[in-house]
Amino acid sequence: MPASILIADDYDDNRELLRLMLETEGYHIREARNGHEALDAAMAEVPAAALIDLSMPSLDGWGLLRALRADSRTRSIPCVAVTAFAATQDRQRALEAGFDAYISKPFRAKELLELVSGILRKGAGEDAHKDGDGR
């Protein structure tokens, strides 16, 4: 079964681009237009990973991350900050806030796919270790 990826971004074009890039690799995609929709989607069906735009209206990416990390069901979802902010301090702030990875727009499909593949492998390794199967 393909891994489920949640994309949270308020711009339709951004969600479509991310979806197309990820679907070519066989990922199952769920989309949300804002942080509230993304939180509801994650609670209904916990995704293998989430790509989160930091600058969404209503509940932004920072608030969404805090909400996901506060709930035991969604706490361990690997979360990637997706943003137009490319400064080193922006990346550092996102990682310190609890994002597992950071990617700035614009990016290449290969860069995104390698990042997603890496966080899914890392997440699978941590899950196996938590279940007692990791050695």
Where are the language model's segments positioned?
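Charged docking surfaces used in two-component/phosphorelay signaling
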Residues: E16-T24
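Short hydrophobic/Thr-rich beta-strand motif most characteristic of the beta2 strand and flanking loop
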Residues: G26-R33, A41-A42
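Active-site beta3 strand of CheY-like receiver
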Residues: E45-L51
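Receiver (REC) domain active-site loop signature in two-component systems and cognate sites
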Residues: M56
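C-terminal output helix
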Residues: F107-V116
